[in-house]
């Protein structure tokens, strides 16, 4: 089974990326092939349905990679920092490039991180988007705070909060259960 984690932070090495890497490790323990598409490291161009924009080749290539991975995915995890009480614009842009066919009846996990006030509002907003894309947002979600992470000597963040480590396992188990036991397989 294949999964795609889309990280919607504009910061390379973000807390959202660290949480995504933690989750990836747990999926891999269950022999799932999971890739992280980090929009800070692989930026894509703004959606332009007119075709008037002069697009860079690297942005075009990144977008094609995202679209291919989305088509191949059996499930998604969407991750975003809390930007002014909602999810990031770059994640919205990435989702605008994808279609209902990419998400139709596939489980979607939602994760977010806040630097200020802890809030699950970005995840509530994403839940509506997932429904509009015909995906199935799983009930368990993860909303962390910067203080739930520690830094390694090289500056890389890692999830240190044991409560969220436990929640991450529940989150992964729930997505795996949805993937393996989907009553909607015939609707894809």
Curated annotation (Swiss-Prot):
Domain of life: Bacteria
E.C. number(s) listed in UniProt: 1.7.-.-
Gene Ontology cellular component annotations, sorted alphabetically: cytosol
MF (Gene Ontology): FMN binding; oxidoreductase activity
Job description of the protein: Catalyzes the reductive cleavage of azo bond in aromatic azo compounds to the corresponding amines. Requires NADPH, but not NADH, as an electron donor for its activity.
Family that this chain belongs to: Belongs to the azoreductase type 2 family.
Protein name stated in the entry: FMN-dependent NADPH-azoreductase
């Amino acid at each position: 089974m294949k999964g795609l984690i889309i990280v919607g932070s504009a910061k390379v090495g973000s807390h959202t990326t660290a949480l995504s890497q933690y989750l990836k490790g747990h999926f891999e323990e269950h022999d799932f092939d999971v890739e992280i598409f980090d929009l800070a490291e692989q930026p894509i161009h703004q959606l332009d349905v007119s075709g008037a924009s002069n697009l860079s080749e690297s942005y075009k290539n990144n977008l094609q990679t995202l679209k291919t991975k989305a088509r191949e995915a059996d499930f998604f995890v969407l991750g975003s920092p809390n930007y002014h009480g909602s999810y990031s614009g770059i994640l919205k842009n990435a989702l605008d490039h994808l279609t209902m066919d990419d998400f139709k009846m596939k489980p979607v996990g939602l994760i977010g991180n806040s630097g200020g006030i802890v809030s699950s509002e970005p995840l509530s907003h994403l839940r509506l988007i997932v429904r509009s894309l015909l995906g199935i947002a799983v009930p368990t979600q993860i909303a962390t705070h910067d203080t739930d992470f520690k830094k390694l000597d090289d500056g890389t963040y890692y999830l240190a909060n044991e409560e969220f480590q436990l929640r991450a396992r529940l989150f992964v188990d729930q997505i795996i259960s949805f993937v393996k036991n989907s009553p909607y397989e015939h609707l894809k």
